[in-house]
Structures are given as C-alpha cells and as structure tokens.
C-alpha cells in the first residue's frame, strides 16, 4: 500500500476511534516493579506476516529490556504491543489504538512505510515515536516528536560502499533491488549515489518485487555484465534466494546489502551462499563494550541463541525510552519525555554510545560486517 494512502487513512482514523476496537495487544506487566511509577508504553511491531523474522527478534530484545527495567524498579513499563503483520493499514489502526490509550511513548514500527503512515498521527497527538529498524530517508522530517535508534541509509549505505570499495577495490558493480518496496527503492537510490561518489561504474540495474521467487532472468543479465561486485537491496526472504541463485550461476562476487540483510534468516535460506555478503550496522556482537558483552551474555542465557541487529535495536529502544522518562522525572507527560529523549547524550547502549542529533537520528559508530561460515563478523578496514 502506498504510504500517501496510509496518511489519508490515518487522518480519517483520528475521527473514528471505533476502528481501533478490533485490535488486540499483549500486556507487558511484570513482577518485581518495586515502587517505580507506571509508564503506559506502546510497541508497534510485526510478529507475523512477511516481516515476522525481524519482528520476533525485536520482541525478544524488547521483552528482555522491559523485564530488566521493571526489575530495577525506578520505572514500571506497562507495555501494549500491537502486531501490524507488516501491513500499513494495520499500522495505522495500531497507532489509533495506542493514541486513544494515551501512551506516554510508543516504540516502533518496524517498517519504514509504516512509520511514514503513522508518524503524522503521533506528531499530531504529541506522543514521541521511537522507530526501531526504520532507516528510510525523510522519516524525521515528519516532526519533532519523531525519533529512531537505527542509523539512516544516508549514513549507513555510503559507509558500506566506502569501506568495501577500499577493502575490495571493485570498479564495476551491478545493482538488483525491490521496486515495489519503498524502503528498498530508497536504499537503491542511496546506493547509486554512493557508488557514483566513489567513482564506481554501475554496469547493470535490475529489479524484482517482494515475494518473487524466480530471479533467473535478472541474474543472467547481471552475470553477462561481468561485475566485480553486486548490490542487493531487499529483505531476507528474497535476498536469500537471490544469493543461492547467484552461486548456482557461478557468480562468486561479493554482495553488498542494506539493513534488510541483517537477519540470521538470510543465512538460513541461503546457506553457504550467504558467505561474502557485506553490510554495515551499528550492532556487532564483537563490539568492545561492557554493555554489549552483558547484553549478548544475558540474551544467550535467556533465549539459547545469539541476538541479531533487530533484537539489539529493540532492546536499546526500550532502554532509551526508560532513560528518557527517568531523566524527565515523569511517566505520564509525553512532552517532557520527548524533550528528555531529544537531549540524551552518550547513552551507553548495547549497540554503542548513542546521542540523538537535532533531527531525531542517532549518532553512533557503524561496524562493517561480513558473513563468514554463516556468522556476521566484524571487518577492520
């Protein structure tokens, strides 16, 4: 669904609170909250549908953070999660529901297109919206109640290109991207400019659509163009299949991905074909930080597997929300919480020290990662 249509739905939704009645949320109450003041927090996520892998990882990280916060006792976070199924209309309905419930802050949503659709609602309601994995350009332009803790493409992708160009020395690159996904179209445009800025020749550009499963025609054309490297802007479902087909065709070039490639599901789908994939992320389990080491240890003990980028980002989001309320001295005044969030500086998070700039974007160091033997490993350039 086009996000502009989502905005129209959003505007109508403010006048139709009855539309919210059909949604169900998941409460986040925990024992041991101590004497902390209760904060009504919303969490817009996608734990089913096409984005479930990302959303379930986010839920794990978020749930763990909330339990830690409530156990500490300074603040008790009473969380209501709403599942959008990766659908813009569902996201709009979720926003209406959480606004009607007078949440002090809302974390999410997961998808950039959803954020664009619901952002104006929260801006109008004066409730801070803290995006988790929303990296598309223009989101922070919606208003001063908009934040995200994931580095935007305008910073992430150019660093991927700059570092891999220096590391690998490629001169000719082919690009393949999803043209019916707003986030990936935005990623393609950013990749294109970054490659041009590095003086790299783009020898082929091909497109696909979300939920496609056959990429033979596009990859045959790319194979014939004989690039030194391939850029793929897509989510893990299509990305994993693209990687497998590339390797089947004898294409062993390095692959540059965007935020959509930061999922263990990509490796599960692609298998050994995922090796030699490069992405940039603020999250790395190898980061030399006590906060990172503790998060990884606690997460492994709780879930019996390693955290990914999305789990880490959601964990950090919950901690940022709690820190903002603590600094604001309130769990009910959204304006004061918004102001406190905007003034967070050098917050020691599991993803590194974090500061919000004047636009609501995070200032945090990025790490270049390479998939080797099925693991995302930090690369020094």
Where in the sequence are the language-model features?
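Short, low-complexity disordered leader/linker segments with a strong preference
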Residues: 1-40, 71-72, 381
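Beta-alpha junction/loop-to-helix N-cap segments that form part of ligand/metal-binding clefts
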Residues: 29-33, 54-60, 72-140, 208-212
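Hydrophobic alpha-helical segments within soluble ligand-binding/sensing domains
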Residues: 91, 149-172, 185-187, 214-216, ...
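Periplasmic-binding protein-like
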Residues: 98-110, 130-132, 174-177, 226-236, ...
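An alpha-beta-alpha
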Residues: 146-207, 229, 321, 325
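Extracellular/periplasmic periplasmic-binding protein-like sensory domains
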Residues: 243-315, 376
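Segments of small-molecule ligand-sensing domains
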Residues: 301-311, 322-375
